[in-house]
Structures are given as structure tokens and as C-alpha cells.
């Protein structure tokens, strides 16, 4: 459905500037509604409307940054560039974005693109001093936004899909798990493919932890981490404060797995940063969830050693 919306934008926009403006406004509305980004950003502005733009010395009306988001649990901002392209995006078309967002005030970067990156551009996103994430058309398609309800006349009024309700077999699995934990402190839930293991893990977690407690969720790949993070934030009935821990090194990443920037969510392999972030944000208003790949579990362990953080559910 999102592809149909974008095609309508193309057919109705006489100029590339108009097309870009429409796409930017759509992405701003999306970031302010998708639970994954609502938990990450406290506000999102068009570049020209960013209230602190001049305070940070940025005066140009539009030289590479399209949107600015305030990081909810951080003093910094995220610079966002929206690329409405049909063909692979060359590195040269990202130059102004990298330069401008590196001058001050920004601690994260996000590129939202409707096309793939060229090989050189993709390589440039890795190992940046200011981390870069990339959101794709597929991310928008799989988001919890009900694109069928989108109105071209009211692009700021997006709607979310309703949250899932447990199916009978998932409710039975939940009951079995809770029963098992009455007599044991660990267990194994085995479910067939396609039966909703990720969602079942969420409803189990929601029954076992309360606000202010902490969960560690381990996965074998960056791709599965991305899928789980999106699924949990979309259907959770309690506020979640999420952290992603994963490595993009060739030694720890399967060739078929995603690159770390494709997670479209800030990730870290720095134990000190992880420990500091958890310690500074943990309170009784949300459940803290650390999503980590198996390969990066040592980072989580080091963070625990530095702060004494204990997980209530693993």
C-alpha cells in the first residue's frame, strides 16, 4: 500500500522539490506515530522548523538535512535525510548530509530511502563517528501503520494497525509457560514455524515483568533482532525502553545477515555506553528491554559488571 501512495505522489507532483516535500512530511508523521520511534524520539521537526537550528549555527534553509528529531533519552539530536529515489543512491548525493550533520548537535543520523544505496554509499555508512541508520521502503511496509487508511489530502493523519490479540494456541502456550515457572526458574518453549513465537514471547514477558524491570532478549542475527524489536514495540501493552546491541564485523555476521545500519535503530557494541544509557533511563515508567545478538553477549556482560544491572527475565 505504501508503494501505491508513493506512486500517487509521483503522478501528482510537478517538480522534484514538491515530491521531496511531500515525502518528508509523510516520514515526519510516520516517525511521530510508529511506537518504535515514538519511544526513541520526543519530537520531530522539518528542518526549517527546528527551534534550535540557529542556536547550533545552522542558517541555510535546506542544505542536506530534511528532518531533525530530539532523542528522548539523550541530550542530542538525530539528523534525518529523506531520499525519494527510483535508482540506487550514489555516495555523492549523501555528501552534504554527512558534512552538515557532523558540525554539531547531532549524535545520530538516519537516512530514509525508497531505493537501495550504491555500493560506495553503503560502505560509507559503516564505522561513522556519528552513527548512521537506514530505513527502507520495506521497513515502512512492515511497520504497524495502516497505510490503507492514508489520505493524500491529510498526510499528517496516519493511523496505526490494531494491536494483536492472542490466538488460542498462544494463550495455551502462555498458560503452560507461567505454570512451568512456578516450579522452575528456566524453561524451553517449542513452537512450530509460523505460529507466532515472537508475539508469544511478548505476552509471556508482559505477564512476568512489571514497569521498572529489565529484560534481555537474545537472538542469532541482526535480521531477527530487527524483526523482534519491531514486533515487540508494535504490540506491547506496556511502555518499552529498548536498546539494541549487535556487531557488524565480518567475523560475527553471517554473509546473508543485515548490516548494522539496516537495523534502522541505534545500536551499540560499547559496554560503557550501554551501561550508562540503561542506568540513566531506567525508572518505573517503562520496561527496559536489551535486544542483543549472541555474538555481542560479552558487551552485555561487561555492562552488567560495570553497573551491577540484573535482568529480571532472559
Tell me the role of every PLM-derived stretch.
Residues 98, 108-112:
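Extracellular/luminal Protease-associated
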Residues 65, 76-77, 106, 287, ...:
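Local beta-strand N-terminus motif with an aromatic residue
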Residues 1-18, 41-58, 102, 114-314:
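SF2 helicase/translocase NTPase motor core
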Residues 19-104, 122-123:
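Catalytic centers of nucleases
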Amino acid at each position: 500500500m505504501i508503494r501505491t501512495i508513493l506512486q500517487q505522489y509521483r503522478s501528482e507532483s510537478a517538480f522534484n522539490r514538491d515530491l521531496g516535500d511531500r515525502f518528508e512530511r509523510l516520514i515526519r508523521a510516520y516517525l511521530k506515530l510508529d511506537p518504535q520511534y515514538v519511544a526513541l524520539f520526543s519530537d520531530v521537526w522539518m528542518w526549517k522548523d527546528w527551534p534550535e537550528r540557529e542556536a547550533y549555527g545552522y542558517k541555510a534553509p535546506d542544505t542536506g538535512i530534511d528532518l531533525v528529531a530530539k532523542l528522548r533519552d539523550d541530550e542530542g539530536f538525530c539528523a534525518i535525510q529523506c531520499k525519494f529515489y527510483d535508482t540506487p543512491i550514489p555516495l555523492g548525493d549523501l555528501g552534504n548530509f554527512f558534512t552538515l550533520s557532523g558540525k554539531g548537535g547531532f549524535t545520530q543520523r538516519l537516512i530514509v530511502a525508497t531505493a537501495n544505496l550504491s555500493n560506495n554509499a553503503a560502505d560509507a555508512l559503516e564505522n561513522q563517528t556519528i552513527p548512521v541508520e537506514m530505513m527502507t521502503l520495506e521497513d515502512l511496509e512492515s511497520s504497524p501503520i495502516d497505510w490503507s487508511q492514508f489520505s493524500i489530502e491529510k498526510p499528517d493523519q496516519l493511523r496505526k494497525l490494531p494491536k494483536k490479540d492472542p490466538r488460542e494456541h498462544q494463550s495455551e502456550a502462555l498458560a503452560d509457560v507461567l505454570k512451568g515457572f512456578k516450579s522452575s526458574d528456566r524453561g524451553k518453549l517449542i513452537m512450530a514455524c509460523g505460529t507466532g513465537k515472537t508475539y508469544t514471547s511478548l505476552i509471556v514477558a508482559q505477564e512476568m515483568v512489571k514497569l521498572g524491570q529489565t529484560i534481555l532478549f537474545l537472538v542469532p542475527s541482526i535480521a531477527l533482532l530487527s524483526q523482534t524489536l519491531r514486533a515487540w514495540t508494535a504490540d506491547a501493552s506496556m511502555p518499552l525502553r529498548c536498546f539494541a546491541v549487535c556487531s557488524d564485523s565480518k567475523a560475527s555476521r553471517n554473509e546473508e545477515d543485515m548490516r548494522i545500519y539496516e537495523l534502522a535503530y541505534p545500536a551499540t557494541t560499547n559496554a560503557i555506553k550501554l551501561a550508562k544509557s540503561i542506568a540513566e533511563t531506567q525508572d518505573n515508567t517503562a520496561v527496559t528491554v536489551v535486544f542483543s545478538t549472541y555474538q555481542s553477549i560479552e558487551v552485555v556482560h561487561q555492562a552488567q559488571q560495570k553497573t551491577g544491572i540484573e535482568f529480571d527475565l532472559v
